């Protein structure tokens, strides 16, 4: 069973990193990665249907324009059931508190521990065992 993941980060090299670190899962058809490079682009993509089913959004917090916390609030308004994992290089208590308050499923500090992230993804609703 394939599922989609939307990665939101204004740094284009993050897309390359995720493609590299999820190469095996992508080849096996476990995950289909989609990328947005701003909060606004993520909302445009979220308004459309994903094939296969979208099960999670991974969003950076610090982005120009709509930041990740504003994006999280908007996603939770439109799709309250959609898990959103916040990813940031700045893991301070205030950002963590706000992410929790706005409904983040996880708060991940960069550099991303991809083994841990993959374990967290396997626990999501809609993910085949």
What kind of feature is each model-predicted range?
Residues 12-35:
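Two-component/phosphorelay signaling modules centered on CheY-like receiver
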Residues 19, 35-56, 77:
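Acidic, metal-coordinating helix/loop segments flanking the phosphotransfer/catalytic sites
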Residues 58-60:
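Active-site T/S-Asp motif of two-component receiver
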Residues 63:
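Receiver (REC) domain active-site loop signature in two-component systems and cognate sites
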Residues 70, 91-108, 116-119:
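Alpha4 helix (beta4-alpha4-beta5 surface) of REC/receiver domains from two-component response regulators
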Residues 113:
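Receiver (REC) domain switch/active-site region of two-component response regulators
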Residues 117-129:
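Receiver (REC) domain switch/output surface
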């Amino acid at each position: 069973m394939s599922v989609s993941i939307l990665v939101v980060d204004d740094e284009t090299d993050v897309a390359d990193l995720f493609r590299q670190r999820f190469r095996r899962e992508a080849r096996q058809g476990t995950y289909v990665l989609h990328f947005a490079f701003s909060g606004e682009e993520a909302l445009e993509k979220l308004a459309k249907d994903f094939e296969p089913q979208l099960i999670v959004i991974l969003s950076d917090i610090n982005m120009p324009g709509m930041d990740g916390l504003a994006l999280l609030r908007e996603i939770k308004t439109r799709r309250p059931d959609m898990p959103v994992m916040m990813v940031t290089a700045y893991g301070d208590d205030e950002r963590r508190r706000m992410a929790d308050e706005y409904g983040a499923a996880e708060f991940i500090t960069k550099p991303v521990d991809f083994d841990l992230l993959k374990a967290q993804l396997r626990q999501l609703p809609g993910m085949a065992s």
